[in-house]
Amino acid sequence: KDSQLQYVKRDFQKNIFNELSRVNCQYIIIDFFVDATQPLIKTNDNNYVSGNLHLRETKLLKCWKDIDFIRQVENEEYFIKWKEDLNIYMDNISKIVPLEKIILVKGRSAYAYKDKFGNRHNVKNPKLSIQQNYFWERMNNHFLKSYPRVKVIDMTEDFWIADFKHPFGASLVHYS
């Protein structure tokens, strides 16, 4: 899909800041879903891109040689790299909008979902959701400690049920 290609291209070119400056946005809404749930890909020339679904669905990933997948779970290397990248990201974003106009959406992966018939099921691998949510919360906490002036929408207080009929597709963070 063209939208997936644009997403992957943006990740490689690291030009999101230019795009955001051009559109003169008033607020920026962020979350750490991809950061907390998808691996980081380290190329043989020490570049990093997110191992998101859009990239994994392309043929590009199969063409790479000597790449490493750095996963979050029990991996301090990932968290250190993430904190370094977060600082660079926030330095750039804060030139586009003030910190008070940045909104963090605190989310989490659901432990249950509704199938296409509306029947509720527990996730097959709750341990994975627990690990991802722990890491996601760790990222949120670090972010809020480092940037206390940002605003927050907290969606972690309720236990959401994922809905596999969600318009954006099946995911444990697409709630009903």
Regions found by a protein language model. Name each.
Residues 3-4, 37, 55-87, 117-130, ...:
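Surface-exposed cleft-lining segments at the edges of enzyme active sites
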Residues 168-176:
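Histidine-centered active-site loop/cap adjacent to the catalytic His
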Residues 104-108, 148-166:
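Acidic carboxylate-rich catalytic motifs and surrounding loops in phosphoryl-/glycosyl-chemistry enzymes
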Residues 112-154:
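Substrate-gating cap/lid alpha-helix
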Residues 26-29, 101:
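Structural motif
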